[in-house]
Amino acid sequence: MWNISEVVFQLPTSSASDRVLQPLWDYLLLRHYTLISSPFFPVLLAFSSYIIFSVPFAVLDVLGEKAPLFKYKIQKDRRPTVGMMLRTLWTAVYNHLVFVLPAVLITNVVMPMPPLPTVAPTVWEMFSGGLGALLVFDTQYFLWHMVHHKNPHLYRWVHAIHHDYISPFSWSTQHLSGVELMTVGFWSNIDPILLKCHPLTVWTLTVYSIWMSVEDHIGYDLPFSPGHLVPFGLLGGAMAHDMHHQKPSSNFAPFFSHWDKIFGTAITVKLTQKSEKEKQVA
């Protein structure tokens, strides 16, 4: 066990010219070392982020037309019921109890966590490491996702549960089979290790990627969402993933849009409307 009393003497001094994230990292090490050094902390962080980000949109769905943001609802004629929300939430809880927690225990026995570093990452290290991990994961999941939609057996066995609902909602983000959840979890853990990301980078990336995943499934095309704020249509967002649930052979990438554009699987509302008009004319 790493002696926390030694941290005080190992911590680098922080100054205006030093790493701007060092004071935050010092605080986490000194005040919350027991929590952040636990092998269960990443799971707690990811699952609590899923809950926190999903609740506001669950409230919007319950309010329906009364909600001020209902005008941004993509499929206004399809609304999740409380029963659907509870079912998808239970799927997430079940998968974590049956698959994730035992996997964490086994991994910690086979490969214990190394001591946390005393030096914080630079802002550039956090940005470049986080972006790199997102791009790698986006590529992995795009290929995995496309293969599972192309192969009927894989689709039925692994991925079909996620398409139980044509109109996605926040809680359905983790409505996954155990196999899919463990695959996604494996990539989410191994990619930052291969890229040598700092733990603070990994945790920040975890929260941000969970937000992006939930935002993909909220069923609302909000004008202030990342998909609209990031220029050149680089991100997919809620509209792109909603279209995937309506047209499953399109928009396979989880976050970015470049792979779908390269492979010709990118579908937008405008393209869909154009295709429908052409069919009507024909």
Curated annotation (Swiss-Prot):
One of its GO terms (biological process) is cholesterol metabolic process. Signal peptide: none annotated. Keywords: Endoplasmic reticulum, Glycoprotein, Iron, Lipid biosynthesis, Lipid metabolism, Membrane, Metal-binding, Monooxygenase, Oxidoreductase, Steroid biosynthesis, Steroid metabolism, Sterol biosynthesis, Sterol metabolism, Transmembrane, Transmembrane helix. Glycans are attached at N3. Its main location: endoplasmic reticulum. A motif (Histidine box-1) lies at residues 144-148. Residues 133-265 form the Fatty acid hydroxylase domain. InterPro entries: Fatty_acid_hydroxylase (IPR006694), Sterol_Desaturase_Related (IPR050307). One of its GO terms (molecular function) is iron ion binding. It is an enzyme of class 1 (oxidoreductase). Belongs to the sterol desaturase family. This is Cholesterol 25-hydroxylase-like protein 1, member 1. It comes from Danio rerio (Zebrafish). The gene is ch25hl1.1.
